[in-house]
């Protein structure tokens, strides 16, 4: 446990380490051609018509390759948003959560086909973890951070990169902590041992993102995203606190030895062009978490809020799953979980 925390802390310090070209083994990636390297869902009737949401699934632990297509189907079918899901892929163009993080293989350079679509996106839902991307792909993220468009950052997005080109504002490096309002400082809840129950912050219960949110629960543990050196920022609005539970069971008792900590908050980021982006950071977000109606509703309400469409948020708008959704558990015990590289098309339905 201590070793994992140390690795994460080292990674946060190394966020802007720039590897030399000789340290990187560039993969020749088979993108499979347009339309085969990512998923697209056309929006049905709904208030989101004409808006394009890009969802990014690029991590090794929390099964975003399953949750992001599900969320895209909900947004497209029930809410009218055009949705595109982008994945981190291996050299064969397969969605591959088993690719090692850079601290396990420092020669690894990750690749997300279709990332150019960030240029035209109206909103981005972002779930990545320790992605070591080319400078060109990092720049696409940086340009989006400067665009004034909304960003919904889930779970590991606050340690979503490893090294590479730094994001600069006013000539200074901008950390993901500064961008999102917090970063990973360790597992407050027991990692893969203690579930999370969300507690709505009383003074902010009227926030549009919390409309219709009645229950928040998931098996991912509570992250500690703030400390004495970097307390909860004054420019952030806390929406939900996460109470660690004593086990992973739905009806488990709270772990009274651990206080609830912020797990969902909003802020406004002003990029290099002076444009202001609405940001929601929600540190839940495993695929199993998204079985919970409250987790789905909060995230989808966040899209409306980010796009300044608060007038379209209603407690009775459905966030029901479209089709079957039986997600795998989080973890890196891939063989036991049955997690293997798969073609993008396997995640469509």
Locate each region found by the language model.
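Nucleotide donor/acceptor-binding cores
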Residues: 51
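Signal peptide processing junction and immediate N-terminal pro/mature segment
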Residues: 16-27
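Active-site rim elements
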Residues: 58-61, 129, 192-198, 214, ...
